[in-house]
Amino acid sequence: MSLIVEDVIRPNANFPSEIWGDQFLAYDQDEQEGVEQVIKDLKEEVKSELLTALNSPTQHTELLKFIDAIERLGIAYYFEEEINQVFQHMYTAYGDKWTGGNTSLWFRLMRQHGFFVSSDIFSTYKDKEGRFKESLEKDVHGLLELYEAAYMFVPGEGILDDALVFTRTCLDEIAKNPSLSNSAVSSQIREALTQPLHKRLPRLEALRYIPFYQQQASHSETLLKLAKLGFNQLQSLHKKELSIISKWWKSFDVANNLPYARNRPVECYFWALAVYFEPQYSESRVFLSRFFSIQTFLDDTYDAYGTYEELEQFTEAIQRWSITCLDGLPESMKLIFQMLVKIFEEIEEILSKDGKQHHVNYIKETLKEAVQSYMTEARWAKEEYIPTIEEHTKVSYISIGYKLALVAGFACMGDVIADDSFEWVFTNPPLVNACCLLCRTMDDLGSHKGEQDRKHVASTIECYMKQFDASEQQAYESLNKKVEDAWKEINREFMITCKDVNIHVAMRVLNFSRSVDVLYKNKDHFTHVGVEVINHIKSLFVDAIIT
């Protein structure tokens, strides 16, 4: 039964309907008999191979290839301790002076694991005139490795900027070769140019890489079998969680009670999984996907439903955390508030088992900050005010909701998380700021056209055009450059500045950035769920990998 019975004329965003129905409501336990022991035995084999190769310097190049395969197959979480030991040993043994083969792979993996090795090692790739050597232009494998390595750049690394331009140009030319149009090489190049490894979601990369790895003559049968069994085992857990989310969603009859809002329970779970895919973060996924849903309702209520006066009252209710402030508001707003209260009560009960119930207060404070930013944007929209870039940035970094989502997800990370992680986020550190800049900018670039078809707060695009008297095209070019610069900042902070931050915490910030490259690249794939995201969801939650 719908709660919406009113005559108030409201804005209508006309969001596309939810497309999954009850598809994920039921969960059938997959047959797992005997699989646990097989996985355990395979893991021991791999651990033995890792440590044997580590103790033999002549095998270190092959060891890097082995670890790269482990990570791309999506099973690195089985071997965190061993992999960390490998890279710590390699950094101690070689520092910046790698003497093995495949320099690009060594460089990429060292930086991925937080070791800021020098990019000067690529100076040997250039000739006396400072150009990349012609001999590199036809080496497809070498070009791909250098291309992927270049995405580990930080601000001011001209040699990596040059390497990226050089490899993009060469790979693009090779991909156009008619004789390669249907080859695996051409497909590999196109995938890399579309989305480099550093920006890919680990779970989606595993799906892509498993069949590719199987085709390689040099593949390890042990790794391949473990990757397939591990993928299916983890998929079973993910499907169980998605069923929990679907039942929670259905219990609120969201489609009828909040018809103006985006109904995206499955997409919210996909997003949470993008950030926390590993098995140990089950509680984070379930909580964050529900919280994402409520964040979406809040965003749409401020953006595409409430009157200005209603939103002022609703904001006060959340700031005071008082249900008595809701008198006279639409039933939909009361429902959202009730959902917030209920989810906070549930998470507080869960956290109290470990004496961490006070972590709920961090989420509440960040929520209040976000809601205040929504209210500021509602005022700007009402007044048709176009702020300066500086004004817009100060508010929109908060309203984009990623700081809130980070804090919410942290709460359920178990022993990994402590008060200092929340306090770190509350200082607005450069890593989090760079992530918010990336997310805000890509969101605006992806959703700008659709949002400006209706009355909407000015996006970064309009602010830039007004402040710099620029064309829309100039604004797009400038903001795309900001996105690339934000990735450089994220890399720098991850490798250099955040050495004292728990690596598992910092990795969530990186994964959030990656998720946006999937959901907001070129368009708003979260609001307008297209074939690409539908296929991602089906492959992750419907289709099993044949073992």
From Swiss-Prot:
Sequence motif: DDXXD motif, positions: 299-303
List of residues binding Mg(2+) 3: D443, S447, E451
Enzyme class: lyase
Family annotation (InterPro entries): Isoprenoid_synthase_dom_sf, Terpene_cyclase-like_1_C, Terpene_cyclase_plant_C1, Terpene_synth_N, Terpene_synth_N_sf, Terpene_synthase-like, Terpene_synthase_metal-bd, Terpenoid_cyclase/PrenylTrfase
GO BP: any one term: diterpenoid biosynthetic process
This enzyme's EC code(s): 4.2.3.39
Pfam family, one: Terpene_synth_C
UniProt cofactor(s): Mg(2+); Mn(2+)
The keyword rRNA processing is assigned to this record: no
CDD domains per UniProt: Terpene_cyclase_plant_C1
Binding site residues for Mg(2+) 1: D299, D303
pH dependence: Optimum pH is 8.5-9.0.
Annotated cofactor note: Binds 3 Mg(2+) or Mn(2+) ions per subunit.
Molecular function (Gene Ontology), one example: terpene synthase activity
Tissue spec. comment: Constitutively expressed in leaves and flowers.
The reaction(s) this protein catalyses: (2E,6E)-farnesyl diphosphate + H2O = epi-cedrol + diphosphate
Annotated metabolic or biological route of this protein: Secondary metabolite biosynthesis; terpenoid biosynthesis
Activation/inhibition comment: Inhibited by high concentration of manganese.
Its job: Sesquiterpene cyclase catalyzing the production of 8-epi-cedrol. Able to convert geranyl diphosphate to monoterpens. Can use farnesyl diphosphate or geranyl diphosphate as substrates, but not geranylgeranyl diphosphate. Probably not involved in artemisinin biosynthesis.
Similarity section: Belongs to the terpene synthase family.
Domain notes: The Asp-Asp-Xaa-Xaa-Asp/Glu (DDXXD/E) motif is important for the catalytic activity, presumably through binding to Mg(2+).
Protein's recorded name: Epi-cedrol synthase
Organism lineage string: Eukaryota, Viridiplantae, Streptophyta, Embryophyta, Tracheophyta
